[in-house]
């Protein structure tokens, strides 16, 4: 487990292949409860290449000096990401 926010990643390997490749991350909040949004790609075994960009929001809780995952929300497509952005922009304008 990670001891600092900088160590948190969603990269993971299976059989020597980086199945989930983190492209970027933005820390949305820090503290005992931290929220991070990640941009990543998943390995497509059939095509033997990485798929389109995906996004996930993860919540971590720091307990006993280590960050532990507490929740996640996966954004399934660029279209869904745009709809989330539009909804938030609409609410923030009010």
Which residues are covered by each model-predicted region?
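Positively charged, low-complexity terminal tracts
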Residues: 1-82, 86-94
């Amino acid at each position: 487990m990670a001891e600092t926010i900088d160590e948190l990643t969603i990269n993971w390997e299976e059989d020597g292949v980086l199945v989930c490749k983190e492209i970027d991350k933005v820390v949305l909040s820090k503290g005992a409860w931290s929220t991070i949004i990640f941009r990543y790609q998943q390995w497509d075994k059939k095509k033997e290449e990485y798929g389109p960009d995906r996004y996930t929001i993860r919540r971590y809780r720091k307990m006993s000096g280590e960050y532990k995952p507490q929740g996640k929300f996966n954004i399934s497509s660029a279209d869904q990401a745009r709809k989330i952005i539009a909804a938030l922009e609409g609410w923030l304008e009010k």
